[in-house]
Amino acid sequence: MMLDERMEDYFEITVKSILKSLSEANNTNNTEIYYYGSKVKYGFNLNKGATDKELRNFETKIGYKIPSDYKEFLQYTNGLEFQNDDAKILDIKEILECYEIFDYPKHMIIIATSLSSQLHIAINLLSSENDNNIYVVDPIADDYFISIKSDFTEFLNRFLSCYGSDYWNWGLDTSDKVLKIEE
């Protein structure tokens, strides 16, 4: 069997395909999963999508155009919450509240939070379309944003797949070091 034939069973990963699959999976009742040592209810609370007028007002308030994949997400669901209450992707109102509260560069908007990781997840609005424009920052401890090398679509797919965990840190161990030059 050729690789192309096997790939017919898979779909192109787009914001629309991710959210469609999420909505279908979300309709399953009483699903529990293993999550960091315990069973938790699996599911998502999806908000009503933002209107074109709400999106225009949002872009006007922040002074930047948002990436098309992120705009597509907001049109489908203006934010979503994980039912384990650990992570969420913010709605426009919450984004604007963060925009006013936190002293971040104006081109960095907080779009998601992860409580267990104590992180804000942001889009760099100065990045070009479909660029690695997603960053994380600890709002208390960090002096800088760290790129997680994803555009919004890739971030959304991974963040939902791992149920809001900080997947960008998996496998990262700064305590295990090896000298690159033998002494």
List each language-model region with its residue ranges.
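A surface-exposed partner-binding patch
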Residues: 1-121
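Long, low-complexity, intrinsically disordered segments enriched in glycines and aromatic residues
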Residues: 76-183
